[in-house]
Amino acid sequence: MVRVAVIRFPGTNCDLEMAWAVKLAGGDPEFVWHEDGGLDDFDAVIIPGGFTYGDYIRAGAIAALSPILEEIRECAEDGRPVLGVCNGMQILAEAELIPGTLTVNVGNRFICDWVYLRVERTDTPFTTKYQEDEVIRVPIAHAEGRYYYENPEEIEDNVVFRFCGPDGDVSEEYNLNGSVGGITGVVNDDGNVLGMMPHPERAAHRLLNSDDGLRLFESLVEWCRS
């Protein structure tokens, strides 16, 4: 059985949905409190969304200082998959485990909506069950989700997901938070650490209005098994 650690911080609030999605994909999720640590026996690590430490200073800044981030860094260096969703992506960015940073949305407002994403890479542990340029539908819910990188052309190979229209067109019309290049999911240079602002765990069953996110977790579990 593929063991997946779901990390909990004060203010985490998407952990149950994340564990449920991992189970649907055939994995064995286990909650790990950030102060407890102990990730050696896990095949993959997930940092779910929420508002860790109330988003004080800025989203993810305090959580990124937790000692468990050093364990997560070691997991990444070992080649194990690490996924950070929404606040999890913010934490990964603060810990410099993925390129770029997240800042407040254009308009300085919280955005909660369904969006379309274009899959840019299918060679990561998280996207093998998608097709390149496939359009998927998942929700977003964040206030500080605008991705920024000073020279985005330098990280073209790191981009995994972009905001797009239903036909796959990338334009500012569909870029709800103002992210540079419509980027909303990136990996590290090794491809095994993914940060993404949209919530695939909230689109893991047809009863949730979309099951497009389930394949991300199926990709993860299958990759770990192989």
From Swiss-Prot:
The reaction(s) catalysed by this protein are: N(2)-formyl-N(1)-(5-phospho-beta-D-ribosyl)glycinamide + L-glutamine + ATP + H2O = 2-formamido-N(1)-(5-O-phospho-beta-D-ribosyl)acetamidine + L-glutamate + ADP + phosphate + H(+); L-glutamine + H2O = L-glutamate + NH4(+)
Cellular component aspect of the GO annotation: cytoplasm
Q: Which HAMAP family match?
A: PurQ
Q: Which SMART domains match?
A: GATase_5
| Location(s) in or outside the cell | Cytoplasm
In what residue span(s) does the Glutamine amidotransferase type-1 domain sit? Answer: 3-226
PROSITE patterns (UniProt xref)? GATASE_TYPE_1
Q: What is this protein called?
A: Phosphoribosylformylglycinamidine synthase subunit PurQ
Its Enzyme Commission number? 6.3.5.3, 3.5.1.2
Instruction: Identify the InterPro entries for this entry.
Output: Class_I_gatase-like (IPR029062), PRibForGlyAmidine_synth_PurQ (IPR010075)
List the Gene Ontology MF annotations in alphabetical order: ATP binding; glutaminase activity; phosphoribosylformylglycinamidine synthase activity
Pathway stated in the Swiss-Prot or TrEMBL entry? Purine metabolism; IMP biosynthesis via de novo pathway; 5-amino-1-(5-phospho-D-ribosyl)imidazole from N(2)-formyl-N(1)-(5-phospho-D-ribosyl)glycinamide: step 1/2
Q: Where is the active site?
A: C86 (nucleophile), H199, E201
Partners and quaternary state? Part of the FGAM synthase complex composed of 1 PurL, 1 PurQ and 2 PurS subunits.
Q: Name one GO biological process term.
A: 'de novo' IMP biosynthetic process
Q: Which CDD domains match?
A: GATase1_FGAR_AT
The alphabetical list of record keywords is:
ATP-binding, Cytoplasm, Glutamine amidotransferase, Hydrolase, Ligase, Nucleotide-binding, Purine biosynthesis
Q: What does this protein do?
A: Part of the phosphoribosylformylglycinamidine synthase complex involved in the purines biosynthetic pathway. Catalyzes the ATP-dependent conversion of formylglycinamide ribonucleotide (FGAR) and glutamine to yield formylglycinamidine ribonucleotide (FGAM) and glutamate. The FGAM synthase complex is composed of three subunits. PurQ produces an ammonia molecule by converting glutamine to glutamate. PurL transfers the ammonia molecule to FGAR to form FGAM in an ATP-dependent manner.
